[in-house]
Amino acid sequence: LAALERVRPALTRIAEILALKRTAINLLDAYLGHQAGAKVLTGQIKRGDGQEINAVIWFCDLRNSTPLADSMSREAFLGLLNDYFECLAGAVLDHDGEVLRFIGDAALAIFPVEEGGWSKKEACEAAVKAAKDALERMAELNRQRESFGTAPLGFGIGLHLGDVMYGNIGTADRIEFTVIGAAANEAARIEGLCKTL
């Protein structure tokens, strides 16, 4: 018992360090995504770092959000956005994609093609499954909205496979992980075409 009492402070410190590491991992995963968060935690990232990757780019956007925002309280509109993102970004995460950023009422995500990971076919299949899942989730959310007498939400999803620069950009004090390149622009353009379909 005396021996345990002597090592207790060291064991307590180890437990605190492990708890802090777990907290850091959870925060980085939540704010940066799993892949980017792991790189930051291990010190592999500095501003301007990037690599060319092949990935399915996912871009989704909520329709008519400005009139919605103008007709609702801030709290209600933020709740609506969270419900919407839970459906769309939640589907991305549940199918092992990585959400890179939320841009107002839009989201950008990737399904990367990697050695030892997904092939192009597998990345495309995962992205399409996520899109179908998102459609089902939004259909359920819209059924709930209609049962409360509110209009259904419109949205679009654009998917495109291509090469992009994946890395971080920003200032010395604030950086952000993103993808840049023609494939990312194409995904956004494809999503925009959903408005007329």
Enumerate the language-model features and the residues they cover:
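Catalytic NTP-binding/metal-coordinating core of nucleotidyl cyclase/transferase enzymes
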Residues: 44-129, 177
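A structural signal for short, well-ordered beta-strand segments
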Residues: 57, 107, 155-161
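Alpha-helical scaffold within the catalytic cores of cyclic-nucleotide enzymes
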Residues: 82-97, 113, 117-157, 182-193
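Cytochrome P450 core scaffold surrounding the K-helix E-X-X-R motif
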Residues: 168-171
